[in-house]
């Protein structure tokens, strides 16, 4: 039977629908469903106009205008649903974005698989001395990184062994020892390390997805969540290319400047030599402003 649809479809997204996109060692992202495209945003903004009533360059210009001026509602007309497999410690950071609908694999009802994340040696670094929430840019020496990986792997395997022992069940749920009594899955799971993988379905509208990507695809974001965001950016580019171009122009590669920062720029344009001491800005504000201008 030939399936037809009257809904808008995006060929580039249809090609990757349901296909797992590998992330990290055992993780993936799959696009499960979506609604809308660039034209849906334009149509919502114009309300009374249907698809195709304006030239493409006018549609693109309108999307640029909407994003540039923070008119968010039209972007909420597009939705996308993902199936994502990710380490638990990243899931806990990810779930802080509360504007999505989420349904996670339940370790109360099912037994988690024996898959855990181990970082590449190049991504193992010490704590940053200036940023309390991230690692330094330089990797640790090879022998130190290897020791770290050995500890992480040993702990994960030992905890999973205890997990099965506590439940008295293997990965498939088969009883290990007929003469022993296991505890409930909802209790046994507490002993697993946070680098074990979980899965969830994550549905979100385009506006909130762009907000998520602006934060999580940023160079300051943790590497392990940033790589997921970078894959999602590629998906957004395939799904809504006009929106992606505007997002890249005004959010990813653009910059917000404070009133004081704008005043500094005006003074510099007028030929004044402005320093941190004469800028009325904090040291951090000044450094961030100077970074914008290279």
Swiss-Prot record:
Cofactor: FAD
SUPFAM superfamilies: Thymidylate synthase-complementing protein Thy1
InterPro entries, sorted: Thymidylate_synthase_ThyX, Thymidylate_synthase_ThyX_sf
Keywords assigned: FAD, Flavoprotein, Methyltransferase, NADP, Nucleotide biosynthesis, Transferase
Active site per UniProt: 216
Residue interval(s) of motif ThyX motif: 96-106
EC number: 2.1.1.148
Pathway terms, separated by semicolons: Pyrimidine metabolism; dTTP biosynthesis
GO molecular function, one term: NADPH binding
Binding-site residues for FAD, renumbered to this chain: 73, 96-98, 104, 205-207, 211
Cofactor binding notes: Binds 4 FAD per tetramer. Each FAD binding site is formed by three monomers.
Binding site for dUMP: 93-96, 104-108, 189, 216
Keyword Transferase among record annotations: yes
Ranges for domain ThyX: 27-250
Keyword Membrane: no
Gene3D superfamilies: 3.30.1360.170
Catalyzed reaction equations: dUMP + (6R)-5,10-methylene-5,6,7,8-tetrahydrofolate + NADPH + H(+) = dTMP + (6S)-5,6,7,8-tetrahydrofolate + NADP(+)
Described function: Catalyzes the reductive methylation of 2'-deoxyuridine-5'-monophosphate (dUMP) to 2'-deoxythymidine-5'-monophosphate (dTMP) while utilizing 5,10-methylenetetrahydrofolate (mTHF) as the methyl donor, and NADPH and FADH(2) as the reductant.
Membership in a protein family: Belongs to the thymidylate synthase ThyX family.
Subunit structure: Homotetramer.
Matching HAMAP family: ThyX
Protein name: Flavin-dependent thymidylate synthase
Lineage, uppermost ranks: Bacteria, Pseudomonadati, Pseudomonadota, Alphaproteobacteria, Rickettsiales
């Amino acid at each position: 039977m030939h399936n037809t649809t009257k809904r808008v479809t995006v060929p580039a997204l249809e090609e990757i629908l349901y296909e797992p996109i590998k992330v990290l060692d055992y993780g993936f992202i799959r696009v499960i469903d979506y609604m809308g495209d660039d034209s849906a945003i334009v149509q919502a903004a114009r309300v009374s106009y249907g698809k195709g009533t304006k030239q493409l360059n006018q549609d693109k210009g309108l999307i640029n205008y909407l994003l540039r001026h923070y008119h968010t509602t039209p972007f909420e007309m597009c939705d996308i649903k993902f199936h994502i497999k990710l380490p638990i410690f990243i899931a806990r950071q990810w779930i802080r974005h509360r504007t999505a609908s989420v349904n996670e694999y339940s370790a109360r009802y099912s037994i988690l698989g024996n898959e855990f994340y181990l970082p590449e040696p190049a991504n193992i670094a010490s704590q940053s001395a200036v940023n309390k929430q991230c690692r330094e840019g330089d990797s640790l020496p090879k022998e130190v990184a290897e020791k770290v990986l050995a500890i992480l792997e040993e702990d994960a395997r030992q905890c999973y062994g205890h997990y099965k022992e506590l439940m008295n069940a293997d990965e498939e749920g088969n009883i290990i020892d007929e003469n022993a009594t296991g505890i409930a899955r909802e209790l046994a799971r507490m002993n697993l390390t946070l680098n074990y993988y979980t899965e969830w379905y994550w549905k979100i509208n385009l506006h909130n997805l762009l907000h998520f990507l602006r934060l999580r695809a940023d160079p300051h974001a943790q590497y392990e969540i940033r790589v997921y965001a970078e894959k999602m950016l590629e998906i957004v580019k395939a799904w809504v290319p006009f929106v992606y171009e505007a997002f890249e122009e005004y959010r990813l590669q653009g910059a917000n400047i404070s009133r004081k920062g704008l005043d500094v720029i005006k003074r510099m344009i007028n030929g004044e030599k402005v320093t941190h001491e004469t800028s009325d800005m904090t040291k951090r504000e000044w450094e961030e402003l100077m970074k914008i201008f290279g």
